[in-house]
């Protein structure tokens, strides 16, 4: 014990000591300490010492199957046990009546909300008692009842249940020193445990087995990947307590949901937390996971942000328990390959899809405005459906025509969009035609030639064939060709690019074959040189498309001859005359009419 000086510094406190004097006659010697520098002394009175003895008694084990008590409020059967607390005190010249406070705590090593045993009466995890010791200070005992909570509410069944008892003096009034000093065994603790189904030695040794596979691979960079982890868990040994399946997720993976094949417990209880900066999904398998238990689990996991993942990602799986011996299964690693892929689509379209030109159309002077026929557009559109980005896209378009007078198509312009850079060979529009001028519509160029009234029909000229020819395919295989080469450095997911080839129908070329019909066909191919990722691609996109424009011919409409009309009119009059004569011959015009009502009245 250290005594601090009650006097100012330099008072020489402790220069002289005097003991063995009982100043207050309490049976304990007091101490006088002198301080000559202060011309004062300090008196320290000794207090009686109470030596306490505390005992806590509880049974060694608790059997959850034996439920001999009921809860007062709910009448629920519970497994209960007795707790006995005994407190005694001894000492020299201590007071005849001594009051002590005793505090009992149940399962004190667990958080208050997670304690496994509670008092039966109050359903609390602790209580405080006031114990009055008699004159002889003989030990007094107090017994209370406690109960074990339901197994479903208990997670930790392996660790011991610790109970503690602590005795202390009642608090005194402010500024007052206690009358006695409490010494001895003021704190004691005992422990009990939950009975386990672990054989004679009461030590459970599980044999946890885990196998796993994955569906949904490979993972694609840029895609919204969903994997299904299929895991088979089993315990071939004794019960595994607090058994759980631990799934360590790689970067970019996120837990979605999990289901088991156990009827009635399909929806697993799974929680995600961090362990050493790694996300881990923990799924409860049972407490305990009993012997010969088999559980199949299907877990859905989404995986994204794979640009820097490398050629594979790994899932680490293990069954863990809190058993002291052989608690865990072997670690299972699932490696899922990562690949790159992009689906690039090429579509072609013709506007208009078909043209109708009169048989004599094309009889125009070359290089005149009338030499220009309807406008024709061939459009090719590229669309990256993803999931990845592509680099080095090359598009090649082949069109039947080189802007020469002998071609059916006069190519005016190439119009790329979406970042494409295109270069035609040979150059287009060599005549420098101002294609912004109004152009004929896709219908026949001179509508007056095709005006028809009720007397007009299609009639060929006598010197021309009376039958149009079957359509002839005009492509780069059968005609001079213009090649358009287009390049795009990068094409992201969802991006579109388009090339429009603008051309006119060259009418003088049509006049050379007045009754021929044509199918104008262009064709395009594309390929991709690489994908901008460190992982190998499944394949490099490539494809082709065709665009066709039908060029149909119509024979000139001819007027109906006048003599045809006269013959028709005379024939009609002749038929009418014959019909009238036949009716007269049979007496149709001499028949008797029935009398009218007016005629009957006159006869009367």
UniProtKB/Swiss-Prot annotation:
Alphabetical UniProt keywords: Calcium, Cell adhesion, Disulfide bond, Glycoprotein, Integrin, Membrane, Metal-binding, Receptor, Transmembrane, Transmembrane helix
Keyword Metal-binding found: yes
Function in brief: Integrin alpha-IIb/beta-3 is a receptor for fibronectin, fibrinogen, plasminogen, prothrombin, thrombospondin and vitronectin. It recognizes the sequence R-G-D in a wide array of ligands. It recognizes the sequence H-H-L-G-G-G-A-K-Q-A-G-D-V in fibrinogen gamma chain. Following activation integrin alpha-IIb/beta-3 brings about platelet/platelet interaction through binding of soluble fibrinogen. This step leads to rapid platelet aggregation which physically plugs ruptured endothelial cell surface.
Any Pfam family hit: Integrin_A_Ig_1
Localization in the cell: Membrane
Molecular-function annotations in GO: integrin binding; metal ion binding
Stretches assigned to the Cytoplasmic side: 585-604
Native organism taxonomy: Eukaryota, Metazoa, Chordata, Craniata, Vertebrata
Protein name (Swiss-Prot/TrEMBL): Integrin alpha-IIb
Subunit structure: Heterodimer of an alpha and a beta subunit. The alpha subunit is composed of a heavy and a light chain linked by a disulfide bond. Alpha-IIb associates with beta-3. Directly interacts with RNF181. Interacts (via C-terminus cytoplasmic tail region) with CIB1; the interaction is direct and calcium-dependent. Interacts (via C-terminus cytoplasmic tail region) with CIB2, CIB3 and CIB4; the interactions are stabilized/increased in a calcium and magnesium-dependent manner.
Membrane-topology annotation of the record: Single-pass type I membrane protein
Residue positions binding Ca(2+): 22, 24, 26, 28, 30
Entry GO terms, CC: external side of plasma membrane; integrin complex
Disulfide topology: 69-80, 86-141, 198-204, 270-283, 422-486, 476-481
């Amino acid at each position: 014990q250290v005594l601090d000086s009650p006097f100012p510094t330099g008072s020489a406190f402790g220069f002289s000591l005097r003991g063995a004097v009982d100043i207050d006659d309490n049976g304990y010697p007091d101490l006088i300490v002198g301080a000559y520098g202060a011309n004062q002394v300090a008196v320290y009175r000794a207090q009686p010492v109470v030596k306490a003895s505390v005992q806590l008694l509880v049974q060694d084990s608790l059997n959850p199957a034996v439920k001999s008590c009921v809860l007062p409020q709910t009448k629920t059967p519970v497994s209960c046990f007795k707790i006995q607390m005994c407190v005694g005190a001894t000492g020299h010249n201590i007071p005849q009546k001594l009051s002590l406070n005793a505090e009992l705590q149940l399962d004190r090593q667990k958080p208050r909300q997670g304690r496994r045993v509670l008092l039966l009466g109050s359903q609390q995890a602790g209580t405080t008692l006031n114990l009055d010791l008699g004159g002889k200070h003989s030990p007094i005992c107090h017994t209370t009842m406690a109960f074990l909570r339901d197994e479903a509410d208990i997670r930790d069944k392996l660790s011991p249940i610790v109970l503690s008892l602590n005795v202390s003096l009642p608090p005194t009034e402010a500024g007052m020193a206690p009358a006695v000093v409490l010494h001895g065994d003021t704190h004691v603790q005992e422990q009990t445990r939950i009975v386990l189904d672990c054989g004679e030695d009461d030590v459970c040794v599980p044999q946890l087995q885990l196998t796993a596979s994955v569906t949904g691979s490979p993972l694609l960079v840029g895609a919204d990947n969903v994997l299904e982890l299929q895991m088979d868990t089993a315990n071939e040994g004794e019960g595994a307590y607090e058994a759980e399946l631990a799934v360590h997720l790689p970067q970019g993976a996120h837990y979605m949901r999990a289901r088991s094949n156990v009827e009635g417990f399909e929806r697993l209880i799974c929680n995600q937390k961090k362990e050493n900066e790694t996300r881990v999904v923990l799924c409860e398998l049972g407490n305990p996971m009993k012997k010969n238990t088999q559980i199949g689990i299907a877990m859905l996991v989404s995986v994204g942000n794979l640009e820097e993942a490398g050629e594979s990602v790994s899932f680490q799986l293990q069954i863990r328990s809190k058993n002291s011996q052989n608690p865990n299964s072997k670690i299972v690693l699932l490696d899922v390959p990562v690949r790159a892929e992009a689906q690039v689509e090429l579509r072609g379209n013709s506007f208009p899809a078909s043209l109708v030109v009169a048989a004599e159309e094309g009889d125009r002077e070359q290089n005149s405005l009338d030499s220009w026929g309807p406008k024709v557009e061939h459009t090719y559109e590229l669309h990256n459906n993803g999931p990845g980005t592509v680099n080095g896209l090359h598009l090649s378009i082949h069109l039947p025509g080189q802007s020469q007078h002998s071609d059916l198509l006069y190519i005016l312009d190439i119009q790329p969009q979406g970042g494409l850079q295109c270069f035609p060979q040979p150059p287009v529009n060599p005549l420098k035609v101002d294609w912004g001028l109004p152009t004929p519509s896709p219908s026949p160029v001179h509508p007056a030639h095709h005006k028809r009234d009720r007397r007009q029909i299609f009639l060929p000229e006598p010197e021309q064939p009376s039958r149009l020819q079957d359509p002839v395919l005009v492509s780069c295989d059968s005609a001079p060709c213009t090649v358009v080469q287009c390049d795009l450095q990068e094409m992201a997911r969802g991006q579109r690019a388009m090339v429009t080839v603008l051309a006119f129908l060259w009418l003088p070329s049509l006049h050379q074959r007045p009754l021929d019909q044509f199918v104008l066909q262009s064709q395009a191919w594309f390929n991709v040189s690489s994908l901008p990722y460190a992982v190998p691609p499944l394949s490099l996109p490539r494809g082709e498309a065709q665009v066709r424009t039908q060029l149909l011919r119509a024979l000139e409409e001819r007027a109906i001859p006048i003599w045809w009309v006269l013959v028709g009119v005379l024939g009609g009059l002749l038929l009418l005359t014959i019909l009238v004569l036949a009716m007269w011959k049979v007496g149709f015009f001499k028949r008797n009419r029935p009398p009218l009502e007016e005629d009957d009245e006159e006869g009367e």
